[in-house]
């Protein structure tokens, strides 16, 4: 239910911000006709996120998963109940005004906050509260993508730090329920459709895929270092941190003016890439510009998920 409400809110803000329409229908910022005014929209969204973080909770900044891990490791899995509504609202504003993020990080953070809050109300042990936090977080991911197995693996690797029946069973049940919710609210279709007649890979193709995996692994390390460098650069600015998301939003708007496909969630970009309908020039442009927009915006400390943009890149 929370996942569906978040998607509705993102679509509503996207329609209002880029098309002046009070509608909850599916919308992408890529088809806007705002011209140079498109630079202002993400900046205004970033400004609102900064205000929410300043007056609400600084914990809404970031993409959700590291923040959940931090609470598990340092705060006995206790997350402020206010994050339950502040995180999805701030993320919807960020994404709906053109932020190059996905909805998976915010829903993971929101589900984790719901589980943690329930655990605090029930007065259970820290370990049981950790399981509830992980169950809520991964149920959220399963609800967005309809991929319970991937969500369970995420919980084991990033949130539970263990593989035992006492934690695996409740998390698995939560993920299955989240997946059922996905099919109920979003339909039976897959999130990213592909051609059914994919040919078997040749030996040369398998070698290329292996090489590509190594290259992407190296680039992943470089990406992490670049984002950290951008975060450090923002910390050196002579302005309060609440202004950083607005500054990052200006960069997002400038990039979005030249390549509108970089704006918003961009699930349609992944679908187009899988179908092979984009030219090489568009693919290279999207990869480079989406990375610049995402890295600067994330480094500015705004709110949004990273999985969808990284899948695109």
Segments (PLM) and residue ranges:
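Alpha-helical transmembrane segments and immediately membrane-proximal extracytoplasmic
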Residues: 1-313
């Amino acid at each position: 239910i929370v996942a569906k409400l978040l998607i509705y809110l993102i679509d509503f803000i996207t329609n209002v911000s880029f098309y002046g329409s009070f509608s909850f229908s599916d919308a992408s910022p890529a088809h806007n006709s705002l011209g140079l005014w498109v630079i202002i929209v993400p900046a205004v969204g970033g400004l609102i996120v900064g205000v929410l973080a300043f007056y609400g909770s600084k914990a809404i900044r970031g993409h959700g998963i590291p923040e959940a891990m931090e609470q598990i490791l340092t705060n006995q899995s206790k997350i402020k109940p206010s994050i339950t509504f502040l995180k999805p609202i701030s993320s919807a504003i960020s994404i709906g005004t053109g932020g190059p993020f996905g909805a998976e990080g915010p829903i993971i953070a929101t589900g984790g906050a719901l589980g943690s809050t329930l655990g605090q109300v029930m007065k259970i042990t820290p370990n049981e509260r950790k399981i509830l936090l992980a169950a809520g977080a991964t149920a959220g991911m399963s609800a967005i993508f309809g991929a319970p197995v991937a969500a369970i693996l995420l919980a084991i690797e990033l949130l539970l730090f263990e593989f035992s029946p006492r934690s695996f069973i409740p998390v698995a049940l939560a993920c299955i329920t989240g997946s059922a919710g996905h099919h109920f609210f979003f339909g039976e279709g897959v999130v990213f459709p592909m051609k059914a007649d994919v040919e078997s890979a040749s030996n040369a193709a398998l070698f290329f895929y292996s090489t590509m995996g190594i290259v992407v692994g190296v680039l992943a390390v470089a990406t992490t270092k670049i984002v950290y460098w951008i975060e450090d650069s923002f910390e050196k600015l002579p302005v309060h941190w609440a202004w950083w998301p607005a500054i990052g939003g200006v960069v997002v708007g400038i990039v979005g003016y030249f390549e509108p496909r970089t704006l918003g969630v961009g699930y349609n970009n992944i679908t187009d890439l899988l179908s092979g309908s984009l030219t090489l020039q568009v693919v290279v442009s999207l990869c480079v510009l989406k990375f610049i927009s995402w890295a600067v915006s994330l480094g500015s400390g705004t709110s949004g998920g990273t999985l969808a943009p990284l899948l695109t890149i």
